[in-house]
Amino acid sequence: MEEKLKKSKIIFVVGGPGSGKGTQCEKIVQKYGYTHLSTGDLLRAEVSSGSARGKMLSEIMEKGQLVPLETVLDMLRDAMVAKVDTSKGFLIDGYPREVKQGEEFERKIGQPTLLLYVDAGPETMTKRLLKRGETSGRVDDNEETIKKRLETYYKATEPVIAFYEKRGIVRKVNAEGSVDDVFSQVCTHLDTLK
């Protein structure tokens, strides 16, 4: 299992809230047969499963604390091991949020093949999030909160991008255009991995 994981294609997908990275991940899954893993989704699924780990996570999250890195990595690894035989590769969405997380991931799971940086400007992301807020009813889609989320995102992400740029595995996609425009750039990068 360990060996298989190490040989898998692993793509970190990084992009701000409203950059459209979720949509791009869905399209990658359809076209390339990759498995899309979002740490947020994994955490939510674990909590609603009512498992012992889920109960522990629920308590941590209710206090507004960060889930321990160890736990997040264990969950990612379990999810990857479960799919390693059938998946063409893995999209790790919203991770790593800091350099240390990336280093730990490599120690425990494997090296990323590529970091796909879905890059949209702050105005575009704000506009998209406000639009989503009209229909989603998500409490975190209002202008004040969005500003804070973007600041947090930039602060956390810049060192991560710089870290992987040194290795030459960052592929930046301009996410200002339409979904299809962005996806054609994504495909250009992914097609080189065959």
Swiss-Prot record:
The modification N-acetylmethionine is found at M1. It comes from the Eukaryota. Residues 131-141 are annotated as: LID. Its EC number is 2.7.4.3, 2.7.4.4, 2.7.4.6. One of its GO terms (biological process) is ATP metabolic process. ATP binds at G18, S19, G20, K21, G22, T23, R132, G177. Its main location: cytoplasm. Belongs to the adenylate kinase family. AK1 subfamily. This is Adenylate kinase isoenzyme 1. It comes from Sus scrofa. The gene is AK1.
